[in-house]
UniProtKB/Swiss-Prot annotation:
ATP-binding keyword on record: no
Organism: Bacillus subtilis (strain 168)
Disulphide-bridged cysteine pairs: none
Name this protein carries in UniProt: Serine hydroxymethyltransferase
CDD domains xrefs: SHMT
GO CC annotations, alphabetized: cytoplasm; cytosol
Gene encoding the protein: glyA
Alphabetical list of Pfam families matching this protein: SHMT (PF00464)
Length: 415
């Protein structure tokens, strides 16, 4: 950085400290990733100066000829990646992408079927503290108490009983493959629209390593970060028949001007997804998650559903006598970043929880391999089993430091 250190030392120091934190800690938050330098350059470009209300060729401002090119590139690449008929890359977040779909097809008070938050769903899938649970009548489905897999019989029974206008699939903490075909069949049986929120698994879908929801769903929403490894933002994919309504729901419905610098970064990251090495990356994300799951299981640590099919693992801490709140703090103290997370049928409060969520997208971007993830699993077990033993915790810190030194992050950044 050339100008910021001299102009605003306080902000620069905060950025520099965050850069140091990312380098010296192991990032296992499942919703986080490390974007490329090219993505960061696009997001920090002069496009941040341009207002561009509307869509390419139909703007409310002049001087949009170059940002039109950028947005068209982003849309075309997303269509190619996922095989979608229509794409909107303007949502500022996944939550706003979901809101736009709801505003497109629902009226206040309409019934919607969505996944219970504590079973792995998302706030925008009907949580009573979120706009979705306030505006609409959400009925919850969940996972089987024994297998901890989605109970499709329960989904069907609730769909038949409540006749929802929309069924929502997708999750923020579900480690297993979702059967989109089964959901489509249930939606058709009750005459419901079908939406998939693939925010967590979009990169795996893009690589062909998880079933693609686009052929089955009326609407697919996603974030553009997480496993897709782009900038923080959202996107909607849908059938052409819904395209104009979706676009109107985003603008002028719930947003004003799009963030063109972020859309440029989305376009760059989509270009990266189309490269052959992205599939290798996504394969490594999954294999690393499986190695981490195996390492934790070997240490006697329980996992929700017994393992993972994707990038994330949900750890059940009850056998260790720990809460998620305590475990998150213990791991942070040794240099591993995670988040407390509810588990299915969790007896603890949402700010305490009985679990932690772990993900491998970020560490895989950093270069961690299967052996490294096996070591990470051993370190986690050492710390959690000995969370009051300062000697053991110091050993864990040293082992974390050895890994972060071995896999440096952003070697070319000058701060």
């Amino acid at each position: 950085m050339k100008h910021l250190p001299a102009q605003d030392e306080q902000v620069f120091n905060a950025i520099k400290n965050e850069r140091e934190r990312q380098q010296t800690k192991i990032e296992l938050i499942a919703s986080e990733n490390f974007v490329s330098e090219a993505v960061m350059e696009a997001q920090g470009s002069v496009l941040t100066n341009k207002y561009a209300e509307g869509y390419p060729g139909k703007r409310y401002y002049g001087g949009c000829e170059h940002v039109d090119v950028v947005e068209d590139i982003a849309r075309d690449r997303a269509k190619e990646i996922f095989g979608a008929e229509h794409v909107n890359v303007q949502p500022h977040s996944g939550a706003q992408a979901n809101m736009a779909v709801y505003f497109t097809i629902l009226e206040q008070g309409d019934t919607v079927l969505g996944m219970n938050l504590s079973h792995g769903g998302h706030l925008t899938h009907g949580s009573p503290v979120n706009f979705s649970g306030v505006q609409y009548n959400f009925v919850e489905y969940g996972v089987d108490k024994e297998t901890q897999y989605i109970d499709y019989d329960d989904v069907r029974e609730k769909a038949l009983a409540h006749k929802p206008k929309l069924i929502v699939a997708g999750a923020s903490a579900y480690p297993r493959t979702i059967d989109f075909k089964k959901f489509r069949e249930i939606a058709d049986e009750v005459g419901a629209y079908f939406m998939v929120d693939m925010a967590h698994i979009a990169g795996l879908v893009a690589a062909g390593l998880h079933p693609n929801p686009v052929p089955y769903a009326d609407f697919v929403t996603t974030t553009t970060h997480k496993t897709l490894r782009g900038p923080r933002g959202g996107m909607i994919l849908c059938r052409e028949e819904f395209g104009k309504k979706i676009d109107k729901s985003i603008f002028p419905g719930i947003q004003g001007g799009p963030l063109m610098h972020v859309i440029a970064a989305k376009a760059v990251s989509f270009g990266e997804v189309l490269q052959d090495d992205f599939k290798t990356y996504a394969q490594n994300v999954i294999s690393n998650a499986k190695r981490l799951a195996e390492a934790l299981t070997k240490e006697g640590i329980q996992l929700v559903s017994g393992g993972t099919d994707n990038h994330l693992i949900l750890v059940d801490l009850r056998s260790l006598g720990l809460t998620g709140k305590v475990a998150e703090h213990v791991l942070d103290e040794i240099g591993i970043t995670s988040n407390k997370n509810a588990i299915p049928y969790d007896p603890e409060k949402p700010f305490v929880t009985s679990g932690i969520r772990l993900g491998t997208a970020a560490v895989t971007s950093r270069g961690f391999d299967g052996d490294a993830l096996e070591e990470v699993g051993a370190i986690i077990a050492l710390a959690l089993k000995n969370h009051e033993d300062e000697g053991k915790l110091e050993e864990a810190r040293q082992r974390v430091a050895a890994l972060t030194d071995k896999f440096p992050l952003y070697k070319e950044l000058d701060y």
